[in-house]
Amino acid sequence: MIVNGGMDDMAVNYIASKYTTVKIGNGGDSTAASQTELDSPVAEKVVTPSVIGSQLIWTAEFTGADIGLQGVSELGIFKTDSDATDDTMLSRVTFTNTGVIANSDTVTFTMRLEVNA
């Protein structure tokens, strides 16, 4: 029998080690459980999340040059396998569009996820 603590540990550590791609985009539709990609991806970064208890925290910085002139209004966490043709989306959030960011300015996005096995 796998006890609760072991299940929690496996879930948190699996997600932390596999879901390391943060993508931003400029879509704004509601997120559906069947959704597999951002509405309109703009940029992505590889980020290993911090683990605090059962909480995972991804922090990704993007410059205005990364974001482009359209701004961004959605963020997703993805698993990318080297042999996969498509990424697997774990979670997606939408927010008010950032608008244009100066090329040399940096925007920091933080995504927190509570994992309960």
Predicted region positions:
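Small cysteine-rich, disulfide-bonded extracellular modules of the LU/uPAR three-finger superfamily
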Residues: 1-73, 80-117
